[in-house]
């Protein structure tokens, strides 16, 4: 397969993004990527990440491509799952305890830390608002984290997310309770399950 065909295939797969590391993994040299970017007038959105001129930048996708350790959580994940209707005011993500996140702790970013035993519990991939797949916590993990950290959330957001989840046909109560036990919020979660289901 020709270099341009490989790159076009990668761009199509990533919704208009060309990620240098993925191109190199596919056998394309960095100089060939640079040449393609110049010839197709692609815009650089981050180190090693380029987009076509007709593509709107997706901050969540770009941030995660640059930082593979992050998992979207909190308000960001609640919004992506449709559990709250108001877009998140800041990007919230979780990283492993001990991870040095100073390079991404910037305006409108909230970094949370989790122990390795629970870090990957409940991870899944869903489309961002722009349609690119990003790694987030599933609905059940989001609800458990929400209940565990309830004082950090506005009451309206908290109530909306709980109500939306409990009234959803897609809820998985056995998984919710399993996570609640591991996160130490079983009693609080059971209170909502008993009252709202």
Predicted regions and their residues:
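A short, conserved structural fragment
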Residues: 41-47
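Nucleic-acid-binding surface
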Residues: 6, 16-22, 49-197
């Amino acid at each position: 397969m020709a270099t341009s065909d490989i790159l076009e295939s990668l761009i199509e797969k990533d919704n208009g993004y060309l990620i240098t590391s993925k191109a190199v993994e596919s056998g394309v040299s960095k100089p060939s990527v640079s040449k393609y970017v110049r010839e197709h007038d692609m815009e650089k959105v981050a180190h090693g990440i380029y987009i076509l001129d007709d593509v709107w930048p997706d901050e969540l996708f770009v941030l995660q491509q640059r930082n593979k350790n992050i998992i979207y959580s909190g308000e960001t994940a609640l919004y992506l799952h449709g559990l709250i209707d108001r877009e998140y005011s800041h990007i919230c993500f979780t990283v492993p305890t001990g991870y040095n996140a100073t390079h991404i702790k910037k305006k409108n970013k909230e970094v949370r830390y989790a122990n390795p035993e629970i870090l990957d519990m409940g991870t899944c991939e869903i489309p961002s608002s722009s349609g690119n797949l990003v790694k987030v916590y599933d609905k059940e993990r989001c609800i458990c984290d929400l209940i565990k950290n309830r004082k950090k959330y506005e009451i309206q957001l908290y109530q909306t997310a709980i109500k939306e989840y409990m009234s959803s046909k897609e809820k998985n109560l056995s998984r919710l309770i399993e996570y609640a036990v591991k996160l130490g919020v079983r009693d609080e979660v059971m209170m909502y399950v008993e009252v709202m289901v």
